[in-house]
Amino acid sequence: MAFVKTEVQGAVEIITIDRPKALNALNPEVLADLKVAFEAVDQETVRCIVLTGEGDKSFVAGADIGSMSTMTKAEGEAFGKLGNDVFLMIESFPIPVIAAVNGFALGGGNELAMSCDIRICSDNAVFGQPEVGLGITPGFGGTQRLARLVGMGMAKQLVYSALNIKADEALRIGLVNAVYPQAELMENVLKLAGKIAKNAPIAVRNCKKAINSGISLPIEKAVEVEEKLFGSCFETHDQKEGMACFLSREKPKPKAVFTNN
């Protein structure tokens, strides 16, 4: 992979978009590398993924305007489909994905961050959907995920105006979960990833599936999804391990060791 690098730290995998001279902008090659990187994740051992951009200036500054400027209608639709296919794969990936947003997250960068389960950003992060100022619409799910995260009114304001917002405003409107100083971003993201990775992985994956599937369903159908996933946990070793440790009378209580079974 020319534009994406990976590193495994215990049960956490860090996937880094590595195109800093272009502020990690997305083009077809970067999107293809992202797809390969996620497909290569060892889902038996990795329990949380951190997605970030190389350097301290940009998570992803957007799609590559140079490569888009000469696209035909058919090429634009194909590029949009490529981005959406990759982002949907990330959104529905069984393992939780945290976006460590270390600078610009504009256009496709904001759309990529929104495809992740959790967004943690540095205090120099900037978010926005500037596409209408370039004569196009968001193409990688921006009109859809932004409304689901921050509400329709705020999403329309940001998309129609093409205005960028800083980290504190992104936190206020619920676009990001937390903000840290740039130098402390990865430390805190990895700390959260480690906490997620310590929990029963089958249960965590089922929670992701329940939330993602249920959000678009009527509540009576959504709770049916949850109850089936809840029930399926009772045939796992991890459920027996977790409850046995909780009920143990030993002092100190033993810590559950989850085996993904």
Question: Where are the regions a protein language model picked out?
Answer:
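Glycine- (often His-adjacent) and acidic-residue-rich active-site loop
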Residues: 53-89, 105, 135, 218
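Hydrophobic alpha-helical membrane-association signature
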Residues: 30-33, 79-82, 112, 185, ...
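Charged catalytic carboxylate motif
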Residues: 29-33, 82, 89, 188, ...
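C-terminal alpha-helix plus adjacent terminal tail
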Residues: 1-10, 41-44, 56, 162-168, ...
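Crotonase-fold acyl-CoA enzyme core
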Residues: 89-202, 232-236, 241-244, 260
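Conserved CoA-thioester-binding segment of acyl-CoA-metabolizing enzymes
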Residues: 1-52, 88
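Terminal peptide-recognition signature
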Residues: 15, 19, 33-34, 51, ...
